[in-house]
Amino acid sequence: MNQANACWGVYREQAHSPNRVDDDAAIMMRVGEAMAERGFSVNLVTSDAVLGAACVNVFAMCERGPILDCLGTMEKAGAVVVNASAAIRNTYRHRMTELFAQHHVSAPVSHIVATDANKPRLADRLWVKRYDFHATQSDDVIYAASESGWRDALRRFAARGIPFVVAQEHVEGDLVKFYGVRGAAAADDAKWFEWFYHRDKGMLGHRFDVARLRQAALAAAAALGLEIFGGDAVIQANGEAAVIDLNAWPSYALYRDRAAQTIADHLTERFERRSRLAPSTRS
């Protein structure tokens, strides 16, 4: 096995995988197996192993800021990291909110609000979410359908030392989940896309064009710079999809084997292209 093809896969931190630790680990292991089948020497590690590590190509599920800083240093030294450290950081909710607005992504109206602000409710129904990470516990997302509910949500976040929230206006419709893999260059370069209805939610049965959902999801991923992504969208009565959440590297639980092969093909292309472009180290 060619050690020049060495790469690391970095697991997501368990605190960032509520009720998904096994599923998140499973997709990483399956991608690692698929990369080994393609001739790579793969080392699957926890995020703490990245601290102070040498420069190596990486596929990463991790989310903590200090780990992303280390991955960013590797990138500056010439390593390929997928998803890029900046793209992973862009999934922090306050960044996502700003980037979705800048790139006109089809998404609910969202507001960044200080938890100590004496601010009246911004809409009749709101999803109040911590401003940085995706949910690590049930209280990281609170539904507020009244003024008292809104103020209680702010108090609860403030009591936990969380200084800001994203208040996302509720959108009525059918909840769907989607998974994708896209190229790093063009916004619409979809290598694979799949969707399904959320099994735990009631259905209104709104008709829609899957191509429009795909377009909205890819635009959202491109806005954040994600290549490997998944998320949630609401299909509205007019058939339009509103992206309500986007994650870097989901568990792909229903499509793990297919996703792993597509991801491995994508990683192989990314890692080998960088190897071809890198300047020779021979004297």
Describe every region a protein language model picked out.
Residues 55-60, 126-129, 178-180, 239-254:
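A short beta-strand motif that forms the metal-chelation/ATP-contact edge
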Residues 100, 121-139, 162-172:
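ATP-grasp fold ATP-binding core
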Residues 8-114, 134:
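Conserved N-proximal alpha/beta basic substrate-recognition cap immediately N-terminal to
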Residues 31-33, 208, 222, 226, ...:
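C-terminal active-site "lid" helix and adjoining low-complexity regulatory extension at the edge
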Residues 142-224:
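Phosphate-binding site of ATP-dependent enzymes
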Residues 44-47, 165-168, 176, 226-238:
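A short glycine-rich, hydrophobically flanked beta-strand micro-motif that places a catalytic Asp/Glu
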Residues 1-5, 49-56, 75-76, 119-123, ...:
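Flexible, charged surface loops at secondary-structure boundaries
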Residues 108-126:
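Rossmann-like NAD(P)H-binding beta-loop-alpha module
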